[in-house]
Structure formats: C-alpha cells, structure tokens
Amino acid sequence: MLKVIENCCDKSYLDMLKYAAQESNGWNLTYPLGYSFEDKHLKLTLIENEPVNELIAGMAMGLLIQIYNSKTESGVPASDFFYPEVLYCGISVKDKNRLDNPHTDHENDTGIIKILGLLNSNWNKKDGGAFIHGDETVHLKPTNFVIFDPRIIHHADKITTHEKRLGIDFTVKRKNNV
C-alpha cells in the first residue's frame, strides 16, 4: 500500500517546523539500529509514545491533523487509512554524501503504517531523494505526504543537491479497512 496525500499543508508551516528542528539540540545518531556509526544518519525524535520534544512534537501533531483532514490523489480521505494516534514521530536528515539503506520497519506488526513527507519547502524533483517503496517511486513534493506499509522495503533515492533534506515520518495505527 502506497498512497500520496496532496497539498495537505501550507509551505510556511513546513518552513516553521524545519526551522524549529534545525535549531533543536536533540539530534542523535541512533538510526538505523544495528548499523555502524558511519552508516547512521541524524534523527530528531519528537514523539516516542509520548512527546520527547514538546514544542516540536506539538507542531508535528498540528501537521498530522492537516494530513488526516486531506485527501489522496484519487480523492479518498486520508482519515480512511489511519488513526491520528502517534506511536513515533521523528525528523531525519539525508544528503548526497550518504546513500540511504533499503529497509523495512515493524516487520511483525500489521497494525502499523507510516506517513512521510519533506520539510524542505523548496525541494524539486531535480534534487533527487525520491521515495522508493517496493517497485514504486514517488518524487516527494513539498506539501505532499505518502502513507505506506513499512513492512515493504523502502528507502530514499540518491540526493543530487548540496542541500540537506529533512524528512518527517510518523508511525501511526492502521485502520482495519486498509
């Protein structure tokens, strides 16, 4: 399952969230779990069952509600796919100096889906970093988010610009009808 939610927020909201994340001192090199230090990327954990960074977690929840109230490219309400109850939310940094690792998440948990989008309001297709999910590729546009099954191999394609790409991801409970 891979669904694109289009134009679900304002670019200025993404800019505000990106700025707050950039100014945070809570960044870590925990992920991906089990990998060597050289293969890890920066991650800012906002919610891990409860808020870790209350200010930015609140901003992220505001974004999630905007996504929840939006529709897919085919007109299906995003609210048909998930409950807006966050199990995890984080912001990651990717750049052209590190290839992303193809991986799966929550392999044994069928009740989970993930939502991913970019905080870079100026990101273009030419900048690279498309989202690859199984055999599907989505060029992430600012204000668009993807809802996807994390048990399918996924990763970011090569980034071609010098700019760092900030992505926000939510782990939420899947609705039974999905």
Residue ranges and their predicted role:
Residues 69-178:
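Catalytic core of non-heme Fe(II) oxygenases with the double-stranded beta-helix
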Residues 1-79:
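Non-heme Fe(II)/2-oxoglutarate
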